[in-house]
Amino acid sequence: MEKREELYRGKAKSVYKTDDADRLILLFRNDTSAFDGKRIEQLDRKGMVNNKFNAFIMQKLEAAGIPTQFDKLLADNEVLVKKLDMIPVECVVRNYAAGSLVKRLGVEEGMKLNPYTFELFLKDDAKGDPFINESHVVAFGWGTAEQLARMKELSLKVNEVLSKLFDDAGLLLVDFKLEFGVFSDGSIVLGDEFSPDGCRLWDKDTKKKMDKDRFRQGLGDVIEAYEEVANRLGVPL
């Protein structure tokens, strides 16, 4: 597979064309950002850890019948993926109250949500990724009602699969965000990544934060926490 020019450079990943029109290469960088890119630092090993963590999770999801863009690992920080037409909407599933939900509603951090909540946010850093609803998505042409229904169905299936996976590793899956795209055959496919950058994970017993909140909140030992999560799951680093 020939790696060609860079198509897009995000906050933590770069996207490259290949000689296959239906495939791209994602490069996971060591860049670590918070607050919509206003704070950026380099954390050694982060690109490698997130790339291998993501590959492990995506393969678990594929095995559970969830279509993902993952194809194969190419290097410590590179992965081959299906080319998707991304829908500019983040799907957020919450099992416990944390982050923006606590700020918006004034509820206690760590409160168990029964049932889980499912939320949508417009993927737009300049606007602060605003909270939206399904009618906004359809009205503004960001996606169709059918696509949204499939995105929700897949998001909840991901929650079911990964909640058990993390629970078995002594971790609480507090919340997570997912992004989806449309493949060349018209199907909705899980894209982007699943790593401690885009979810909240707490130790089941101590409630120690094991995710990017360690960076956001200045708790330190960010990569050490990521690696501990990976080791608990059996991710080969």
From Swiss-Prot:
Superkingdom to which the source organism belongs: Bacteria
BP terms from Gene Ontology: 'de novo' IMP biosynthetic process; cobalamin biosynthetic process
Gene Ontology MF annotations: ATP binding; phosphoribosylaminoimidazolesuccinocarboxamide synthase activity
Gene3D superfamilies noted in UniProt: ATP-grasp fold, B domain (3.30.470.20), Phosphorylase Kinase, domain 1 (3.30.200.20)
Pathway as given in its UniProt record: Purine metabolism; IMP biosynthesis via de novo pathway; 5-amino-1-(5-phospho-D-ribosyl)imidazole-4-carboxamide from 5-amino-1-(5-phospho-D-ribosyl)imidazole-4-carboxylate: step 1/2
GO cellular component annotations of the record: cytosol
EC top class named in words: ligase
InterPro entries referenced in this protein's UniProt entry, alphabetically: SAICAR_synt/ADE2_N, SAICAR_synt_PurC, SAICAR_synth, SAICAR_synthetase, SAICAR_synthetase_CS
Pfam families in the record: SAICAR_synt
Family: Belongs to the SAICAR synthetase family.
UniProt-recorded name of the protein: Phosphoribosylaminoimidazole-succinocarboxamide synthase
Organism of provenance: Pseudomonas fluorescens (strain Pf0-1)
Higher taxonomy: Bacteria, Pseudomonadati, Pseudomonadota, Gammaproteobacteria, Pseudomonadales
